[in-house]
């Protein structure tokens, strides 16, 4: 079976993150490339979990790391910190994403359990919101 874009990207990311930045707990590939639905011009979505809450801007690390990843992969990279991402985005990363590397299995699992609990705790509110929005749209 020939390697897919997903396989090649995962391999390149694993090689890139052999020595991840300090404080990295885990790295995930998510989005269209992880789902094997990417187009030639699709960007590569990468999520990083840090052991401590990084600054919201991540300017220095984020820009430098994104630039290095773009050079390595030869395509645009969208890099996010899971520490600041909304629960629904984290859920999508965990549900559809591919774990590329982890430095601390126990810290990764604690984070995943906590975020999944938050996500499912809010699910009734999301359902009610969607139902109300659909009813409002149906009356207009």
Predicted regions and their residues:
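Short, aliphatic-rich beta-strand segments
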Residues: 45-48
């Amino acid at each position: 079976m020939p390697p897919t874009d997903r396989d090649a990207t995962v391999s390149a990311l694993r090689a890139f993150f052999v020595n991840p930045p300090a404080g990295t707990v885990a790295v995930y590939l998510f989005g269209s490339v992880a789902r094997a639905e990417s187009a030639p011009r699709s960007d590569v979505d990468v999520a990083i979990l840090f052991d401590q809450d990084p600054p919201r801007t991540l300017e220095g690390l984020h820009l430098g790391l994104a630039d290095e990843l773009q050079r390595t992969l030869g395509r645009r990279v969208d890099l996010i910190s899971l520490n600041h991402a909304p629960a629904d985005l984290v859920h999508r990363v965990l549900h559809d994403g591919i774990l590329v590397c982890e430095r601390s299995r126990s810290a990764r699992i604690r984070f995943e359990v906590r975020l999944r609990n938050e996500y499912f705790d809010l699910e009734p509110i999301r359902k009610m919101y969607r139902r109300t929005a659909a009813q409002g749209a149906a009356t207009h």
